[in-house]
Curated annotation (Swiss-Prot):
N-terminal signal peptide: 1-22
Bias kind Basic and acidic residues: ranges: 62-74
Domain notes: The cysteine framework is XIV (C-C-C-C).
Descriptive protein name: Conotoxin vil14.5
Domain of life: Eukaryota
Organism name: Conus villepinii (Villepin's cone)
Maturation-removed propeptide residues: 23-85
Keyword tags: Cleavage on pair of basic residues, Disulfide bond, Ion channel impairing toxin, Neurotoxin, Potassium channel impairing toxin, Secreted, Signal, Toxin
Alphabetized GO MF terms: potassium channel regulator activity; toxin activity
Record's GO cellular component terms: extracellular region
Tissue: Expressed by the venom duct.
Length: 112
């Protein structure tokens, strides 16, 4: 989200600059630029976005957050420590001897 705000600020400031570069001979390299409706709309949108952010409201452009449902395994919590250790060892054995060829750290990450 911070990157989008930074991009909007850069776009608004560069489009709001009062001068553009001109390479016509005999003229000043800078001439006044016209402020377009698009630049004004962008500045207005940025102002609203920053005002909402200051108020603590989520901006309209942001996607609603999707929460994943928690996957709970009650049978694992009810197992004894020795039984859990056996399951981890068995998982490690099948992971390391499998056809896929996982490394030890990959298997350890998946099994624990």
């Amino acid at each position: 989200m911070g990157f989008r705000v930074l991009v909007l600020v850069v776009m608004a400031t560069t489009s709001a600059l009062p001068f553009t570069f001109s390479e016509e001979p005999g003229r000043s390299p800078f001439r006044p630029a016209l402020r377009s409706e698009e630049a004004q709309a962008l500045r207005h949108g940025l102002t609203l976005l920053l005002a909402r952010r200051a108020d603590g409201q989520p901006p309209d452009m942001r996607q609603p957050e999707m929460r994943r449902p928690e996957v709970r395994q009650p049978e694992f919590a009810e197992l004894s420590v020795g039984q859990r250790r056996w399951d981890v060892d068995q998982c490690m054995y099948y992971c390391l001897t499998g056809v896929v060829g996982y490394s030890y750290t990959e298997c350890q990450t998946m099994c624990t």
